């Protein structure tokens, strides 16, 4: 399925520009979450219509394999960074409320009180 925000060829060109002259197999270009220390609680939100959806699923699996806690939310029919587009996507506001609750819960679970003292 085609990503409405960017073509695959354009995304590949951006990666090539970023890593120009570096072997694609170089360890600095590979994210090894599963082989490192466990990450803190992580929330990943991905749009169901974005080309990075498979990457989001892979990252969530790696975080869990590495002993971390990860919540993956896939928002149907949404594009990459839909959360930044509340005028175009009503789901953006709902998604950001999930983010706020996730942060609040993660902080409370670790004994950190919100600065305002108000629960989200």
Kindly give the residue locations of the regions a language model identified.
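Alpha/beta-hydrolase superfamily serine-hydrolase fold, recognizing
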Residues: 1-120
